Design a protein with these regions (language model features):
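Conserved acidic, metal-coordinating active-site core of Asp-based
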Residues: 81-83, 87-167
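Active-site phosphate-binding/coordination module
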Residues: 5-103
Length: 167
């Protein structure tokens, strides 16, 4: 982050303006980013807006629809080669790994969070899921979204799509 940006953020705070970091990342993966920016943010808007928190304890969150999550997990079962990143409030994991995922993760450099693997059948049944990011093509995205009435896709990278609540 350029020093001019850091100076500008600090000047805003000195003038009473609250600053938030807004990202598609989940709170559980924010420390690797926040550790590279020497600014104390007043809050986080994470998971593409699905999880918002500030330093005073305010929290607003909106998880994926449980029926849509179950449909996505079944779809992943039918497409065993597809890797997906699955985000909960305090934990982010992959269903498995492949070369495409490893290349993408390596491109994050020092902002790449730790990678964990888990069973989405178990985790999604026991924990709210805020975002699922399968490594799929645009055609596969259209196929999957046609099955999900309460979910939309947000794509900022050619290798994967972030699936978030539609509303």
């Amino acid at each position: 982050v350029p020093q001019s940006t850091i100076d500008a953020l600090r000047a805003l705070q000195a003038n009473g303006v609250k600053i938030f970091i807004c990202t598609g990342r989940p709170p559980a993966q924010m420390s690797v980013v926040l550790n590279t920016i020497p600014v104390d943010f007043d809050g986080i808007v994470g998971f593409n807006g699905q999880y918002c928190v500030d330093g005073s304890g305010f929290l607003e969150k909106h998880a994926l629809d449980a029926t849509d999550v179950a449909t996505i997990v079944r779809w992943l079962d039918e497409h065993e080669d597809i890797v997906a990143c699955i985000g909960e409030e305090d934990y982010v994991y992959f269903n498995h790994s492949n070369d495409q995922m490893r290349r993408t993760w390596a491109s994050l450099g020092k902002t790449a969070p730790d990678v964990f693997f888990d069973d989405p059948h178990v985790r999604t049944a026991e924990h709210e899921t805020f975002q699922m990011s399968p490594y799929i093509s645009r055609d596969q995205e259209a196929e999957l979204l046609s099955l999900l009435p309460n979910t939309r896709g947000v794509r900022w990278h050619p290798d994967f799509v972030d699936l978030i609540p539609a509303d």
